[in-house]
UniProtKB/Swiss-Prot annotation:
GO terms for molecular function: DNA binding; DNA-directed RNA polymerase activity. The RNAP catalytic core consists of 2 alpha, 1 beta, 1 beta' and 1 omega subunit. When a sigma factor is associated with the core the holoenzyme is formed, which can initiate transcription. Its EC number is 2.7.7.6. This is DNA-directed RNA polymerase subunit omega. Promotes RNA polymerase assembly. Latches the N- and C-terminal regions of the beta' subunit thereby facilitating its interaction with the beta and alpha subunits. GO terms for biological process: DNA-templated transcription. The keyword Transferase applies. Residues 104-142 are annotated as: Disordered. It catalyses: RNA(n) + a ribonucleoside 5'-triphosphate = RNA(n+1) + diphosphate. GO terms for cellular component: DNA-directed RNA polymerase complex. Residues 108-142 have a biased composition (Acidic residues). The keyword ATP-binding does not apply. It is an enzyme of class 2 (transferase).
Length: 142
């Protein structure tokens, strides 16, 4: 049964990868409530993925419209990721640049040992922030 639906779908959409993307977009629309199944009584009890494939196979949805919705959704996603990347880098830069004057000892009597300790503390803080950034990027990719 599912194989015949896929065969019908490939008659409508020649590329199987594009078919998967279009079915994904249609399923997303159904899951979010953006639209209802065209024949809701017929598909009662079916999962939205199967409903999407049936609708594509039977030409009940416009594949060109689905593709344009998919492209716009991808663009929004990329804009969100890019703005998050830039905003997080900006906030890290602000943290590094906004040290208060009390954090730096400007006395001329400071010996080299205390300066080395402060340098080590700053390097540790920067490496901790870098490791947190890597962890955040890994979490976002998952």
């Amino acid at each position: 049964m599912a194989e015949s639906v896929i065969e019908k779908c490939t008659e409508q959409v020649s590329n199987r990868f594009k078919l998967a993307l279009l079915a994904s977009q249609r399923t997303h629309d159904l899951n979010t409530g953006a639209s209802n199944p065209v024949q809701s009584a017929r598909f009662k009890g079916h999962k939205n993925t199967i409903i999407s494939l049936y609708e594509i196979a039977e030409r009940q949805v416009d594949t060109h419209e689905l593709f344009s919705l998919l492209v716009s959704r991808c663009k929004e996603y990329m804009k969100g990721n890019l703005s998050n990347t830039y905003s997080s880098n900006t906030s890290k830069l602000e943290k590094l640049l906004n040290f208060s004057n009390d954090q730096f000892n400007t006395d001329a009597d400071v010996d080299q040992e205390s300066t080395d300790i402060q340098d080590d503390e700053v390097e540790n803080e920067m490496s901790n922030q870098d490791s947190e950034d890597i962890d955040d990027e890994v979490d976002n990719e998952e």
